[in-house]
From Swiss-Prot:
This is Ribosomal RNA large subunit methyltransferase E. It catalyses: uridine(2552) in 23S rRNA + S-adenosyl-L-methionine = 2'-O-methyluridine(2552) in 23S rRNA + S-adenosyl-L-homocysteine + H(+). It is found in: Cytoplasm. GO terms for cellular component: cytoplasm.
Length: 212
């Protein structure tokens, strides 16, 4: 059986996939974020959130439900995403200056401080099937997400990002820790057991110029 056929079979049998269809979420990824929120209380009413790599929208939908009508959710992705009520969507690469400037302008317009309370990223690279290549690409996306968070995350804010376990992750953690009071690894039960994906949860941002 090819990798693609095996994935399709697993996908069709996956209880989280079935649950997402039943409950109206665009993807099973919503349950990873819900589980993390239930344990760590990421979201509060009226929070301002950036969702990087948001398509197809599972995390954005969860975020908007939890921050409520007075909160702001800005979603960004290279891929198109179905329109969601009260979610601002930017299609493009946030690493490109023009797109980042657009993101920054929206944050400035929609928030009092020009910063957000929470930056979340469930980004994953296009999977090649070559483990070390995919892991390296995943880590690169994490570094891009962190670059964005440095510029737009408010002091006291939270950064949540997915990464594939492997070389370079420990080094990234060493570089990240001085900027946050709390940093931990998470593996939600909705993550497939054979997947190398984990989540880095960094809380109580000290500010980018605040090095310990």
């Amino acid at each position: 059986m090819t990798h693609s056929k095996r994935w399709l079979e697993e996908h069709e049998k996956d209880p989280y996939v079935k649950r997402a269809k039943k409950e109206g979420y665009p993807s099973r990824a919503a349950y990873k974020l819900l589980e993390i929120h239930q344990k760590y209380k990421l979201f509060k009413p009226s929070m301002n959130v950036i969702d990087l790599g948001a398509a197809p929208g599972g995390w954005s939908q969860v975020a908007k439900d939890l921050v409520g009508p007075k909160g702001v959710v800005i979603a960004i992705d290279l891929l198109p995403m179905q329109s969601m009520l009260d979610v601002i969507f930017i299609q493009g690469d946030f690493n490109e200056p023009e797109i980042f400037n657009q993101l920054e302008a929206i944050v400035a317009k929609k928030t009092l401080t020009g910063q957000v309370d929470l930056v979340i990223s469930d980004m994953a690279p296009n999977i090649s099937g070559i483990k070390n290549v995919d892991q390296s690409r995943s880590l690169h996306l994490v570094e891009l997400a962190w670059d964005c968070a440095q510029k737009l995350l408010a002091r006291g804010g939270t950064f949540l990002v997915k990464v594939f376990q492997g070389p370079g992750v420990d080094r990234f953690l060493i570089n990240l820790r001085p900027y946050f009071n709390q940093v931990k690894f998470l593996k939600p039960s909705a993550s497939r057991s054979r997947s190398s994906e984990i989540y880095i949860l960094a809380g109580e941002f000290l500010g980018y110029n605040q090095r310990v």
